[in-house]
Amino acid sequence: MENLKNELLEAQVGKVLENEPLANHTTMKIGGPADLLIIPKDIDAVKTIMDHVKKHQTNWTVIGRGSNLLVLDKGIRGVVLKLGTGLDHLTVNDEEITVGGGYSVVRLATSLSKQGLSGLEFAAGIPGSIGGAVYMNAGAHGSDISKILVKARILFEDGSIEWLTNEQMNFSYRTSVLQKERPGIVLEAVFKLKQDDREKITKKMQQNKDYRKETQPYNRPCAGSIFRNPLPEYAGQLVEKANLKGYQLGGARISDMHGNFIVNAGGATAQDVLDLIQFIQKKIKEDYNVEMHTEVEIIGEEN
């Protein structure tokens, strides 16, 4: 690992941090250390990093803004790539835009609304990066990323990079081909939007933001929705029906605002969150015979 670190420092690929606590890089403020955390300065740097990682046959993981993510207490072995400011480029060409995987979803939605471009209003208030949003087909208010994506540039596990069309992404509810069939990371994406009245777009976005503020605990350290909705049921409603709102294990607490959110109430460990997730799953299965599957990504070395 020392040789790899020195090579990456010499190649000037961006910021290279050793034994970096990932709690500093997740919205839940939980997570053990990464052996090496690298914040690449651009897409070319990502390619260089991957060449060195493959040469050293080192494990690698990619994160974005750390939302929708639970990093385990022992952290992550090998290299963690954090896609941030180095991959937050944006090009607007009429109704088609190209945006980096590290670009903030909220920032993009706001920027496009000011230009009268409609299609991303549903994302107002969604934390996280474009890369993560495409990876999991993020959505809200009856729409999702699959409705507007044209294609995405993907870094695959073997280090190769290629463009995948919307059809090739094989989108479904909160999933894409990148999660299991062809594991990969979104470096940039192309979206097709529509011109519309700016005032109308801004009003719709504000309504969506207000709804989130009123119903979801984004002022507390959390990872967004913990469970996928077991349609036609809704995860949050099932948790509330089971009278679990406010239930706490260690430092992890089911939000008093929304049953599908677990907040870090202070000093929570990943194990606290896992224990609470398993408790909820068991309770809902016993009471309603419904399987609850996690939406939050759980990564890292297990205890």
Curated annotation (Swiss-Prot):
Provide the GO MF annotations for this entry: FAD binding; UDP-N-acetylmuramate dehydrogenase activity
Cofactors: FAD
Q: In which pathway does it act?
A: Cell wall biogenesis; peptidoglycan biosynthesis
Described purpose of this protein according to its UniProt entry: Cell wall formation.
Location of the FAD-binding PCMH-type domain: 30-196
DNA repair keyword on record: no
The record's section on InterPro entries has: FAD-bd_PCMH (IPR016166), FAD-bd_PCMH-like_sf (IPR036318), FAD-bd_PCMH_sub1 (IPR016167), FAD-bd_PCMH_sub2 (IPR016169), MurB (IPR003170), MurB_C (IPR011601), MurB_C_sf (IPR036635), Oxid_FAD_bind_N (IPR006094)
Family named by the database record: Belongs to the MurB family.
Q: Which residues carry out catalysis? A: R174, S225 (proton donor), E295
Q: Transcription: is it a keyword of this entry?
A: no
* Top EC class, one word: oxidoreductase
Organism, as annotated:
Bacillus pumilus (strain SAFR-032)
Tell me a GO cellular component: cytosol
The EC number(s) this enzyme carries: 1.3.1.98
State where the protein is found.
Cytoplasm
Gene Ontology biological-process annotations: cell division; cell wall organization; peptidoglycan biosynthetic process; regulation of cell shape
This enzyme catalyses: UDP-N-acetyl-alpha-D-muramate + NADP(+) = UDP-N-acetyl-3-O-(1-carboxyvinyl)-alpha-D-glucosamine + NADPH + H(+)
What is this protein called in UniProt?
UDP-N-acetylenolpyruvoylglucosamine reductase
